[in-house]
Curated annotation (Swiss-Prot):
This is Minor structural pilin EpdB. Minor component of the type IV-like pili. Essential for pili formation. Keywords: Fimbrium, Secreted. Contains an amino terminal motif QXSXEXXXL, which is part of a class III signal sequence. Signal peptide: none annotated. Residues 1-4 form a propeptide. The N-terminus is probably cleaved by the prepilin peptidase EppA, which recognizes the class III signal sequence. It comes from Methanococcus maripaludis (strain DSM 14266 / JCM 13030 / NBRC 101832 / S2 / LL). A motif (QXSXEXXXL) lies at residues 9-19. Disruption phenotype: Deletion of the gene leads to completely nonpiliated cells.
């Protein structure tokens, strides 16, 4: 291996790193900061909804009176629980899912990015949801 080959490989690696940095910093500029914030909020809401749903499904096979406390990070959004549907919607996103168990009707408005405490209680025929 000659000295020239090492420096060529170094230059190629350096240019690849430079291209990666330029592309990653261009993304908010191309799509706009607002679009990037919407995508981040939607992703966060999807993760929170998925965590709540999986805990509801686990609780649905538990005995009556079982209780779970779930903490999720939520973007500014409206949370709606109705029949077997959970819906989270906010600025630029609308995500919903269905569960295998009935839910009590409950609405909650998260006015800012915060950690929600979701209280889940298994009743005789449904799961009661309360958010604090």
């Amino acid at each position: 291996m000659s000295k020239g080959q090492v420096s060529v490989e170094f230059i190629v690696l350096f240019l690849a790193l430079l291209v990666a940095v330029v592309v990653s910093t261009m993304t908010p500029g191309i799509f706009g900061l607002n679009k990037s914030v919407e995508l981040s909020s939607a992703s966060l809401a999807h993760a929170a909804l998925s965590k709540v749903k999986s805990n509801i499904e686990i609780l649905s096979v538990s005995g009556e009176g079982s209780y779970k406390l779930v903490y999720v990070k939520s973007p500014p959004a409206n949370w709606t629980f109705e029949n077997r549907t959970i819906r989270v919607y906010g600025n630029g996103f609308n995500i919903s899912t269905n569960t295998s168990v009935d839910l009590n009707t409950y609405n909650y408005l998260a006015s800012s990015l915060k950690i929600l405490s979701v209280n889940l209680t298994r009743n005789d025929k449904n799961v009661t949801v309360a958010i604090q």
